[in-house]
Amino acid sequence: MTVTPHLFIPGPTNIPDAVRMAMNIPMEDMRSPEFPKFTLPLFEDLKKAFKMKDGRVFIFPSSGTGAWESAVENTLATGDKVLMSRFGQFSLLWVDMCERLGLKVEVCDEEWGTGVPVEKYADILAKDKNHEIKAVFVTHNETATGVSSDVAGVRKALDAAKHPALLMVDGVSSVGSLDMRMGEWGVDCCVSGSQKGFMLPTGLGILAVSQKALDINKSKNGRMNRCFFSFEDMIKTNDQGFFPYTPATQLLRGLRTSLDLLFAEGLDNVFARHTRLASGVRAAVDAWGLKLCAKEPKWYSDTVSAILVPEGIDSNAITKTAYYRYNTSFGLGLNKVAGKVFRIGHLGMLDEVMIGGALFAAEMALKDNGVNLKLGSGTGAAAEYFSKNATKSATALTPKQAKAA
């Protein structure tokens, strides 16, 4: 019997059956008079996932990187000064994009395993009396190192300095899994993608934009050249329920069902489930005598754990053993932590028993590659935690059942 490898990477994530079935439909006319009846409510419901107070959400047929680019090109001009930090592969790539697009980037280089340096940001913003900095960037969840950063803290720093800079957030591996309070935190652009917390295949770049950022887009002269990722083209057609070019219609149908599942479970319950699963993984890591790449508990991510392996052991060998011997996929270490960590993704459509299987495979792969641990130690610690904290699995419920649960 052939079994599809068990997937525990930090994206793409597992796709619920209901979402797959929603996408398994014939092609449809994306310019039919009926199409807006589907898309207009979808745009509005997406705003709920970001907890927005105003503004709008754009859906591009791209990965999250496309949404990154759109956020930058539509709100900033070549030569604008921006404040960023670099502490993992994806925060690094965002800095690289901004530099290549012609922005003047002030970078705070931080140790991998830490996150956005809120105190440094506060000091830099307080000293920027002429408001030369036009935007401040935050990678909410750095998947390369399993680090989450304090978006609300950055907003407080901006407010304390009475600074008007835009607050730009990479929420690719956080939205739909970790709490994102875009309105409360005063986030101006929040980037996400379909393949993480939204539990879809890759292919949708989702960008939530505040009214402040929309107003800047409308009034500012000298902005970057753009075409495919233009806000103006999107607004003109989205208002009618359409798109400026061919949309990924099946993915949009899947997104509708994904949102229904998230709302049926309740966003706060979704976030609590991710915290429980992450806590179980951390209990296992501790029992194995290993450490996370994240340096302190304040940095711990509830969507992915990057686990440091002992010196002299190649983490790539562990992921290969897990894949070929135990039919389980874990994330590789990237860039500076390549060969030093492997990553367990615990986001999306997962519950305690599924995570238990991931830990079972990880434990055996670690042991097979010479890590000194006792089989059953990590899985036992996680089971102990889950047995005390688990609730009825939301992933097993249909939206109708979840409402009644």
Curated annotation (Swiss-Prot):
CDD domains tied to this protein: AGAT_like
One Gene Ontology term from the biological process aspect of the record: glycine biosynthetic process, by transamination of glyoxylate
One of the Pfam families matching this protein, by short name: Aminotran_5
Record key words, sorted: Aminotransferase, Pyridoxal phosphate, Transferase
Reactions catalysed according to its record: glyoxylate + L-serine = 3-hydroxypyruvate + glycine
Coiled-coil segments on the chain, per record: none
Essential cofactor(s): pyridoxal 5'-phosphate
InterPro entries: Aminotrans_V_dom, PyrdxlP-dep_Trfase, PyrdxlP-dep_Trfase_major, PyrdxlP-dep_Trfase_small, SP_NH2Trfase/AEP_transaminase
SUPFAM superfamilies documented for this protein: PLP-dependent transferases
Transferase among keywords: yes
Pathway(s) this gene product operates in, as recorded in its UniProt entry: One-carbon metabolism; formaldehyde assimilation via serine pathway
EC identifiers of the protein: 2.6.1.45
Molecular functions per Gene Ontology: alanine-glyoxylate transaminase activity; L-serine-glyoxylate transaminase activity; L-serine-pyruvate transaminase activity
Residues the record lists as N6-(pyridoxal phosphate)lysine modifications: K196
Entry similarity comment: Belongs to the class-V pyridoxal-phosphate-dependent aminotransferase family.
PANTHER family xref list: ALANINE--GLYOXYLATE AMINOTRANSFERASE 1 (PTHR21152:SF24), AMINOTRANSFERASE CLASS V (PTHR21152)
Protein name: Serine--glyoxylate aminotransferase
Gene: sgaA
